[in-house]
From Swiss-Prot:
Pfam families linked to this entry: DUF441
Name of the featured protein: UPF0756 membrane protein NMA2160
InterPro entries with a match to the protein in the record: UPF0756_TM (IPR007382)
Main subcellular location: membrane
Keyword Zinc belongs to the record: no
Membrane topology: Multi-pass membrane protein
Highest taxon of source: Bacteria
Entry annotated with the keyword Transmembrane: yes
Subcellular locations according to the entry: Cell membrane
GO CC terms: plasma membrane
Family, similarity comment: Belongs to the UPF0756 family.
Length: 148
């Protein structure tokens, strides 16, 4: 008999999402559980291959949309010369670099993904975080365990 813990893990994520009032975990885990338990399972490899990139695109659209709606303005060039703005630019560069280290690590050592997911779920469910953590966490982890 071949038993998979994936459905149990997804149900656990759904329950954690409901208890912690975190819609992103609840919806994501529900969609994946439905895909796994139906004929939609054939599309899981497609989601696995392109989901991260599509998620980053949607996240970027969400971050940039206030510029389009007028709720946020592009600051004048002079404002880029203050400490907060320069710090924001360098921190953005650093975090993007960290995530860039994390993606290859997740591909080279997929067993670590489980630990990163558990940590991310705990951070999202109980600490008010958002689920962009696995990439950054993998980047930080790459310093601990090496690049691959």
């Amino acid at each position: 008999m071949n038993f998979s813990f994936a459905p149990l893990f997804l149900v656990t994520l759904i329950l954690l999402g409901v208890v912690s009032n975190n819609n992103s975990i609840t919806i994501s885990a529900t969609i994946l559980l439905l895909m796994q338990q139906t004929a939609l399972i054939q599309f899981v490899p497609l989601v696995e291959k392109h989901g991260l990139n599509l998620g980053i695109i949607l996240l970027t659209i969400g971050v940039l949309s206030p510029l389009v709606s007028g709720k946020a303005q592009v600051p004048p060039v002079a404002e880029f010369l203050n400490f907060k703005m320069i710090s924001a630019v360098f921190i953005g560069i650093f975090v993007a670099w960290l995530a860039g280290r994390g993606v290859p690590l997740m591909g080279q050592q997929p067993v670590l993904i489980t630990g990163l997911l558990i940590g991310t779920v705990i951070g999202v469910a109980f600490m008010g975080g958002i689920p962009v953590g696995p990439l950054i966490a993998a980047g930080i982890l790459s310093f601990v365990v090496g690049k691959g």
